[in-house]
Amino acid sequence: NGTQHLFEEDPSVFYVSTHQYPHYPGTGSYSETGIGAGKGATLNCPMDVGANNDTYTEVFTEKILPAVELFKPDIILISAGFDAHQADPLGGINLTTEHYAWMTQRLMECADRHCNGRILSVLEGGYDLDALALSVASHIKTLKHFDNVI
């Protein structure tokens, strides 16, 4: 929610978030699309408890990727939170390690098309240390274009 609020009035930054909703702190509904000049530059994709790989694939394919294609970013910044992993004790989302690699690959393809592959990832959440380690490794291997993603 801090990143969303930082850029919600800036039309030069397209902010996208997938997250469990409702969940603390209660922000991130579909209706939050930006403020003022930034209206329309925020895409929240709230997920119900129990959302899984199929749910995320659908949202990525039907909402996120088309929106990113329209925006044509100069760089893609990933706030890589792994607390949606099925083993994470704090959330209710059921993503697998492999699906993090799938999402990373889709974003890399967008970066290749629109910003000469410029992509930056920073680590955010993830509270099951084994799942976090595997997911981060999978994400980094994908970013490095390794063929043998976990």
Predicted regions and their residues:
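A general "terminal functional-core" signal
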Residues: N1-I150
